[in-house]
Amino acid sequence: MKRGSLLWAYMAALAAGAVLAGQATGADPIKIGVVNMLTGPLAEGGRFTVNGLQLAQEEINRSGGVLGRPIELLTEDNASTNPGTVLAFSKLFTVAGIAAIVGPIASTQVQAASPAIAKAGIPTMIGGTDPSLTRVNNRWVFRARPNDLYSSKVIADFGVNTLKLKKWAIVHATDAFGQGGAKALTEALQALGVNPILDQGYSSGTQDFAPIVLAVRKSGAEVLGTYMTYPADQAIFAKQLRQLGVNIQWVGSPTTVTVTARNLAGEALHGTYAVVDFNADANDMTRAFTKQYTERFGVAPDNFASWSYDALHILALAMNNARSTEPEAVRNAILAIKGYKGLEGTYEFDRNGDGLHGYSVVRNEGGKVVFIKRVDFPVE
């Protein structure tokens, strides 16, 4: 979808949500800000985020809203950039009555905005998985996805103990997500007695991966572990990897099986493994959501849609439980959530603000994502 079409589609969705909110109740709406990628290289993922939020907003408002009031979403485009994210947050912080914010999925964007979020003191749900994001003394950031301390352990364990492979090459973006993931994966492998034989970083938006592919081939690696931020980068890398004759096993982060990456890469990603926070076939809830989403939007959902859907529902639950939209009350109510079943898993927030603590392993079989196993970790 072109950027202009995406933006117009999003505005139409907002209008539909506003009408629905008006139908739910005549009370003044509760304002929730959204910082999302409507333009730029992550705009396709932003479209899935829009759709997930729209479905959640409709469900919440149909069921009576929050504290008897409808939810209104106020969205700012971050243009898929760090400066755009900081600007988007600053605009939302000036809006009177913002009760909470659904922030970005990209770790580097969350990292850029974290000081401003801490200063504003507004509860903010994030989808970025860099472990450090909830460990920087920012009491207003809460994660609605599992972080990469968990994904790295699952990737390492599956590759070493299930696939029985010990010669690892790690390829990652050099942003917060990629570097955080690569560091965590290296540590997880070392805990299993394995030292990676290659670590290669790249800048997001790279078009020529040939030097990295050749380095992987020359290294003699048996298995590839990846933390790649942009689905388009994932697809380009996969195609160039296959074109240059590298067909080793591959266990990647969730980007590996996003709808966008699979559509762009086609056969180049067939046979690869990945860890995922959202599995469409995990249970009755995810299957029902996938059916509803696909019928509504004409494409299957991925984690961009599932995490934003869960994030809005969690905020609504916290405000209802707190019987308040006051920031401190909402913060405490989020941290008190235990056993809430969402699309991404069962939420139990720890003291850092992390709500999920496990991943599933899946395989791309001919373009279809097939479940292999689920791994959960104790809440610290």
Show which residues each predicted segment covers.
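Extracytosolic ligand-binding ectodomains
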Residues: 2-11, 15-17, 22-380
